[in-house]
Every structure is written in structure tokens, then in C-alpha cells.
């Protein structure tokens, strides 16, 4: 394994990814070349930095560091999202509930290449709250020809009201070419649980399938996505930084016990060139397509 001559300890994570830890006490995360880390993240899809000094609980320091990775995606709240339970949550992201597998930027005009997570404080293992990742790149490589062709010919429509900082309609093939054009990846947002209580509960419609056929398709796909060969659940430790490839991985979250000390910060980094999202368009508050908004 090529570690690109970074001064640290590197080990493989099963079933995919790398765990990078310091070579000496008090080693600062800024001692690791960003270009080398970016290459590792592109090759291994998931890079976990554990045990380094960073000071990233200060949002300004986190923002300054992540700017070295590339152009940052800006949201109405800024570039850093505090992912933590709120007393009156506006959606499931800011609650303690599970989050279904998805890709970030699906309801935006551009899709970021990386998520960079920093763990301010971690829950105990028994409290839940692991972040889940699925290596769709490898899943497709291992799929049968019939399975791949079925997925490649499947188109899914997702719709959600804009009640927080995202919303709209996405019409996307289940299998897409990676933005760099050299491999196939899966773009999928799992259905929410029926008992989900939030207004941003999204709908999932698979074109050409009746209701029972869609349910069977979703169950089959669920079993493939959660196959241990492609599925990794990250147990957070305070101070962890995780860089994940948003093009090749899907990610989600396990539910956690309410009022657990789970606090992550998340930043999105664009690729070069920026990946335009041609599958997205806005919808009006009445849920009809807003024809006055340019489709991207």
C-alpha cells in the first residue's frame, strides 16, 4: 500500500478505507500534506484521522483547514454544519433518529466530492449513532451482469418539501458514471421509515414498477447495500476527522439515544471541476414543478 510518504501510521480498515494515526505525541493534523490525504481519499474512499491535534472545535480553524482541500460548498448556515441533536429539531438530521443512506448535494445544483467530518464529542458505543458508509463502487464491480443491467436501467424520482436548507425533485438513474467518467457508482436515497415524523419526509418512486414490485426491489437492494463486504459503520471517538468520497460512497446514520453527547461538524468540498447536478430541479410549495426555475 502506497502511503504517499506521510509521517504517520496507516492501516487498512475492513471492508474499505484507511485509519491514520500519529507517529509521535501531540502530532498536529496540519503536518499531513493535504495533497497526499486527498489522493488517499480518492483511492480508498474513506480516510479516518484519529489522535491528531487540530483545534477544529473552533469553526474558523476548521474552515481554514478545509479550504486547502478545495472550493467549499456554502449553505444558508455557512460552510460548517453542526450535526447534533437539537431541543426542537427541524428535521431528522438534527434529531437522534436514523438517517437513511443517501448522497449529499442531491437537492443542490452541485454535488460535492468530499464530506469532511470532525467529531467534537462522541457518544458511548452503547448509545448508538454510528455513521454508515457503503462502497457502491465495489458493489457494482461484484454485481452479476443481469443485476448490473437491471440497476443501470432503473430510474428513480425523489421528492421532498424544502422545510430546512434543502428540497426539490431529483430524477436520477440508480447507477451513474463517476464524475471522472472511469467507473460506475450507485446514487440512491433509501425510503424513510413510515413512522418518520418530519415534514421533509421524501418520496421514492421507481419508474415502471407497481407498488408491490417497488417494495420487492427495495428489499433486494437493501440486502445488497448492507452486505458486510460493502458496508462500514464508523464508531466515533472525540477528535476523529473523517474524509469520505461522496461520489462513490453512500452514507447514513444509526439512531442514537436522545441527549447523548454526539456532536459532529461537517464541511462539503467540491471536486475539480465542480460536479454539476443535472438530476435536480426545484419544486414549488404546492409540490408542483416550478417551471420558472431553470433546470440544471
From Swiss-Prot:
Reactions this protein catalyses: (2S)-3-(4-hydroxyphenyl)-2-isocyanopropanoate + 2-oxoglutarate + O2 + H(+) = 4-[(E)-2-isocyanoethenyl]phenol + succinate + 2 CO2 + H2O
Effect of gene knockout: Deletion of pvcA and pvcB abolishes rhabduscin biosynthesis and decreases virulence of the strain.
Positions that bind Fe cation: 102, 104, 251
GO terms, molecular function: metal ion binding; oxidoreductase activity
EC number, as in UniProt: 1.14.20.10
Function: Involved in the biosynthesis of rhabduscin, a tyrosine derivative which is a potent inhibitor of phenoloxidase, a key component of the insect's innate immune system. Catalyzes the 2-oxoglutarate-dependent oxidative decarboxylation of tyrosine isonitrile.
Family assignment from sequence similarity: Belongs to the TfdA dioxygenase family.
Name by which UniProt lists this protein: Tyrosine isonitrile desaturase/decarboxylase
Organism encoding this protein: Xenorhabdus nematophila (strain ATCC 19061 / DSM 3370 / CCUG 14189 / LMG 1036 / NCIMB 9965 / AN6)
Amino acid at each position: 500500500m502506497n502511503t504517499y510518504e506521510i509521517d504517520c501510521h496507516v492501516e487498512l480498515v475492513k471492508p474499505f478505507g484507511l485509519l491514520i494515526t500519529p507517529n509521535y505525541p501531540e502530532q498536529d493534523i496540519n503536518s499531513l500534506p493535504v495533497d497526499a490525504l486527498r489522493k488517499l481519499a480518492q483511492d480508498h474512499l474513506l480516510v479516518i484521522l484519529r489522535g491528531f491535534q487540530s483545534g477544529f472545535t473552533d469553526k474558523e480553524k476548521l474552515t481554514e483547514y478545509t479550504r486547502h482541500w478545495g472550493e467549499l460548498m456554502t449553505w444558508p448556515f455557512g460552510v460548517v454544519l453542526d450535526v447534533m441533536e437539537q431541543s426542537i429539531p427541524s428535521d431528522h438530521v438534527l434529531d437522534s433518529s436514523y438517517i437513511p443512506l443517501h448522497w449529499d448535494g442531491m437537492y443542490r445544483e452541485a454535488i460535492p466530492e468530499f464530506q469532511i467530518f470532525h467529531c467534537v464529542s462522541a457518544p458511548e458505543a452503547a448509545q448508538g449513532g454510528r455513521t454508515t458508509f457503503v462502497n457502491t463502487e465495489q458493489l457494482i464491480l461484484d454485481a452479476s451482469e443481469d443485476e448490473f443491467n437491471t440497476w443501470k436501467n432503473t430510474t428513480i424520482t425523489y421528492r421532498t418539501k424544502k422545510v430546512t436548507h434543502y428540497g426539490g425533485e431529483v430524477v436520477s438513474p440508480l447507477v451513474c458514471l463517476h464524475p471522472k467518467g472511469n467507473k460506475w457508482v450507485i446514487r440512491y436515497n433509501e425510503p424513510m421509515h413510515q413512522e418518520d415524523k418530519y415534514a421533509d419526509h421524501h418520496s421514492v418512486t421507481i419508474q415502471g414498477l407497481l407498488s408491490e414490485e417497488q417494495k420487492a426491489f427495495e428489499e433486494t437492494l437493501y440486502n445488497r447495500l448492507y452486505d458486510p463486504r460493502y458496508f462500514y459503520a464508523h464508531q466515533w471517538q472525540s477528535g476523529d476527522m473523517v474524509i469520505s468520497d461522496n461520489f462513490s460512497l453512500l452514507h447514513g446514520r444509526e439512531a442514537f439515544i436522545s441527549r447523548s453527547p454526539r456532536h459532529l461538524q461537517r464541511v462539503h468540498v467540491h471536486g475539480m471541476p465542480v460536479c454539476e447536478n443535472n438530476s435536480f430541479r426545484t419544486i414549488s410549495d404546492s409540490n408542483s414543478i416550478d417551471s420558472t426555475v431553470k433546470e440544471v
